[in-house]
């Protein structure tokens, strides 16, 4: 857009100023005789502005030349370049990513939208920016990171890593020890192994001698 305005300014100034100046005093030259013909395609040495047909448009209209002024290091993240043809010019059109609007709402006591006349003096104004979750920089809420809220509060015991929340709420003082019966142990013993039995037959223990 800036280059188009610059081109129009150059055209207006070229038409308003005189085309030829006197080489000696700088005064406008006299009118040529009717028999004298000046070629239009040949540029005169004392001509202030050359003919517009001799100026290459590729030097004036350079689309995208003002983009490095805003971001000289690199192109903006998320921009897309689409080639297009404008007459003899070949440029690139810059498309900005879709920007989501900023919502500003004024809420009353009951949470309803109120006008400026009905608002109290100490009104609350909530401002939020909608960010698409696929955009870079989007932050997920803490409840959606994969961990449960009740698990994030405290560490789990050793044997309760996969237990239900009802079991996680029990304190160490209320836990009951595991009781194994002899019948269950005998059923769980493999066939090739023998269980060690505690026998007290034939073993006597003498009390220590007491000195009187």
From Swiss-Prot:
Is a promoter of calcium phosphate mineralization, playing a critical role in the formation of the compact, mineralized, aprismatic enamel surface layer during the maturation stage of amelogenesis. GO terms for biological process: biomineral tissue development; cell adhesion; odontogenesis of dentin-containing tooth; positive regulation of biomineral tissue development; positive regulation of enamel mineralization. It is found in: Secreted. Keywords: Biomineralization, Cell adhesion, Glycoprotein, Secreted, Signal. Pfam families: Amelotin (PF15757). Residues 33-42, 165-178 have a biased composition (Polar residues). The keyword Heme does not apply. O-glycosylated. Belongs to the amelotin family. This is Amelotin. The keyword Signal applies. Residues 23-42, 141-212 are annotated as: Disordered. InterPro entries: Amelotin. Highest expression in the mandible. Found in the basal lamina of maturation stage ameloblasts of incisors and unerupted molars. Also found in the internal basal lamina of junctional epithelium in molars. The lineage of its organism: Eukaryota, Metazoa, Chordata, Craniata, Vertebrata. One of its GO terms (cellular component) is cell-cell junction. It comes from the Eukaryota. It comes from Rattus norvegicus (Rat). Residues 1-16 form the signal peptide.
């Amino acid at each position: 857009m800036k280059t188009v305005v610059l081109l129009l300014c150059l055209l207006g100034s070229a038409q308003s100023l005189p085309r030829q100046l006197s080489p000696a005093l700088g005064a406008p030259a006299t009118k040529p005789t009717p028999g004298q013909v000046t070629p239009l395609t040949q540029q005169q040495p004392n001509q202030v502005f050359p003919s517009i047909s001799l100026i290459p448009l590729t030097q004036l209209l350079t689309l995208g030349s003002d983009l490095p002024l805003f971001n000289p290091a690199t192109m903006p993240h998320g921009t897309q370049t689409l080639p297009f043809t404008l007459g003899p010019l070949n440029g690139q059109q810059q498309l900005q990513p879709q920007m989501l609007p900023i919502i500003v709402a004024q809420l009353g006591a009951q949470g309803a939208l109120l006008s400026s006349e009905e608002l109290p003096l100490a009104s609350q104004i909530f401002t939020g920016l909608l960010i698409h979750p696929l955009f870079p920089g989007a932050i997920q809420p803490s409840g959606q990171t994969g961990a449960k809220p009740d698990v994030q509060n405290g560490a789990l015991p050793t044997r309760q890593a996969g237990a239900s929340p009802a079991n996680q709420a029990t304190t160490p003082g209320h836990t009951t020890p595991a009781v194994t019966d002899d019948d269950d142990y005998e059923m769980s013993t493999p066939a090739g192994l023998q269980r060690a039995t505690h026998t007290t037959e034939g073993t006597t223990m003498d009390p220590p001698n007491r000195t009187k």
